[in-house]
A protein has these predicted regions:
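Structural signature of FAD isoalloxazine-binding scaffolds in flavoprotein oxidoreductases
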Residues: 69
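Glycine-rich beta-strand-to-loop/alpha-helix junction loops that act as flexible
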Residues: 49-52
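Anion-coordinating catalytic cores for phosphoryl-, nucleotidyl-, and glycosidic chemistry
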Residues: 64
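Structured mid-to-C-terminal alpha-helical surface segments
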Residues: 1-46, 57-60, 72-73, 77-279
Length: 279
């Protein structure tokens, strides 16, 4: 079942960008994992968060490479790795899957050699497809939840997720606190997808008459600043550091159209958001 569904995705005539195709394949695998998680008596208590949550439950218009969950119960990542592999084995009859738990016990890597099976990219050696599931223990009591139904491929799944106000606060926190490495040594102060997602939140907020606002109590508890005014200043300073070419490079594998992404960056360059956080 999995192999046939992945082949349909790869064979779509409009799919030309290899990195975008890879992330479409990852999304299909994510669908199976989400079906497993929220039909399991223990793991259904995981709180869905991150970019995939924004896409599946709230309509974010980009792909997401990973699955992110928070937990507030006695969660065993080793048990998760074992049970998700057994799910692929028994329920999906796919025996070539393997799992690995990271050394810090916060991530499960799920590996499937699908491109090798389908002989994709004959001009080079196909790589395995990895989907990572990241798990974090809740560190703030300031949050709201939303129980909702998502469409995950052919599955309809009821998920426990953060509400938009909480996810808005999470995204601002990620934008302010997250750095990553371009190549081996060059450290960048932002991820392009965080910039893109903040813009998306602002569009949703605008359409709601600015009734959608980040959960300020959560922001203050996560960032440990003295006031919202200080957080606003931090956001403005970091936005000034954003280089559009790095946003383009990071987000391009996650959207279908490079032309659309260029249009987004033109708009971004014109106003650099204005006020990101509303009183």
């Amino acid at each position: 079942m999995i192999v046939q569904n992945i082949k349909k995705i790869i064979d779509r005539p409009q799919n030309k960008n290899r990195l975008y195709i890879r992330n479409l394949v990852k999304e299909e695998i994510q669908n199976y994992i989400l079906n497993f998680v929220y039909n399991d008596s223990v793991f259904q208590n995981l709180i869905f968060t991150g970019g995939t949550c924004l896409r599946k439950l709230y309509g974010l218009d980009r792909l997401s490479e990973d699955l992110d969950f928070d937990y507030n119960f006695n969660f065993s990542i080793d048990n998760f790795a074992l049970k998700v592999k057994n799910y692929f084995y028994s329920q999906l009859t796919y025996q070539k899957v393997s799992t690995k738990v990271s050394g810090n016990k916060q991530t499960v890597f799920i590996k499937l050699p699908l491109f090798k099976e389908l002989n994709v990219y004959q001009d080079r050696t196909p790589e395995d497809v990895f989907v990572r599931c990241d798990f974090s223990k809740q560190i703030s009591k300031e949050y709201g939840l939303n129980t909702g139904m998502i469409t995950a491929g052919t599955f309809k799944v009821i998920v426990e997720a953060y509400d938009l106000e909480t996810l808005f606060a999470n995204k601002i926190t990620a934008f302010l606190r997250r750095s990553f490495y371009k190549g081996k040594f060059q450290k960048l102060p932002f991820k392009g997808r965080d910039v893109y997602d903040l813009f998306w939140f602002l569009q949703i907020s605008s359409k709601s008459g600015y009734h959608l606002k980040p959960n300020n109590k959560r922001l203050l508890s996560l960032i440990k600043e003295r006031s919202m005014d200080q957080i606003k200043q931090d956001v403005k300073r970091k936005i000034a550091l954003v280089d559009p070419k790095y946003v383009y490079k990071d987000v391009l594998p996650l959207v279908e159209s490079g032309q659309f992404l260029n249009q987004f960056l033109e708009i971004f360059n014109k106003d650099r958001y204005g006020d990101v956080i509303y009183d």
